[in-house]
Structure formats: structure tokens, C-alpha cells
Amino acid sequence: MAADKPLRLLLGFDYGTRQIGVAVGQAVTGQARELCVLKAQNGVPDWNRVEALIKEWQPDAIVVGLPLNMDGSPSEMSERAEKFGRRLNGRFNLPVFTHDERLTTYAAKGERLAQGQRDGYRERPVDALAAALLLEGWLAEHPN
């Protein structure tokens, strides 16, 4: 999906059926940081919370992680993530892009392990960190 204006601020979503990680990133720096983890029921978030994030951050675009298989083929979750992206576009009229998110959760757990977290991923989930990593990946591939 093409954007009509320069993309300066973006929100990234690491889609999941129980939790959706959210991050914010800036095109000028190419960096992203984790914001929050939204609870979801069978992949459906609290749309009021999503709307509040959109209003607060006023992003120019959204990036949704696309969970591909290791061979690059679509996974069972790929269609659900794409549908989530279409819903974001329909509700908020923002450009939505997808980005390969393979190994972002693995990398996020590695970062947390390096910070000393050995377990407790329910109490301190890595979904928002995974969203930041996938958003940084998208920003690296799409420099302004």
C-alpha cells in the first residue's frame, strides 16, 4: 500500500491471537521502541485501545508483522495478520504495510535473556519488543 505523504512516525504491531505487541518508530532515526501489549481474544483486540494509541501517537502509517514459515511461504497465521492489517486500514484510514517477522520473537527473547530475564514471559511478555524489532526491520528496508 502506498503512502501519500512522508512517513515519519509509524506504529508496529506484532499480531497474535492472545496478545498483540505494539511499538512506535521514527523514520528519521530508523529506531523503534516498545509501547505496550494489547490483550486479544482469538486475535481480536480491544479496538478502543487501538484507537486510543492511534489518537495519541498519530502515526503516518502502520506496519504489521507477517508470520511467514521459515521457507518464506505463508503460515497459518499470515492470513489472520493480513486481515488484521486490512481492519486497521479500514478503521483508521492509514497506510498499512506488512513485514516479514520471522525470528523476531526469538530475537526478542534473546535480548531479554541478555538482560537477565530467564522466564516469566507471561508477566513480562516480549510481544512489544518483537513489534519494535519488526518495525526497525521495515524502517531499514524503507529509508526515507
Swiss-Prot record:
This protein's UniProt keywords: Cytoplasm, Hydrolase, Nuclease, Ribosome biogenesis
Location within or outside the cell: Cytoplasm
Pfam families in UniProt: RuvX
One BP term from GO: rRNA 5'-end processing
Keyword Hydrolase among record annotations: yes
Its EC number(s): 3.1.-.-
Family annotation (Gene3D superfamilies): YqgF/RNase H-like domain
GO CC term, one of those recorded: cytosol
Gene Ontology molecular function terms on file: nuclease activity
InterPro entries with a match to the protein in the record: RNaseH-like_sf, YqgF, YqgF/RNaseH-like_dom, YqgF/RNaseH-like_dom_sf
Its biological purpose: Could be a nuclease involved in processing of the 5'-end of pre-16S rRNA.
NCBIfam families per record: RNAse_H_YqgF
Family to which the UniProt record says this protein belongs: Belongs to the YqgF nuclease family.
HAMAP family named in the record: Nuclease_YqgF
Protein name stated in the entry: Putative pre-16S rRNA nuclease
Taxon lineage: Bacteria, Pseudomonadati, Pseudomonadota, Gammaproteobacteria, Pseudomonadales
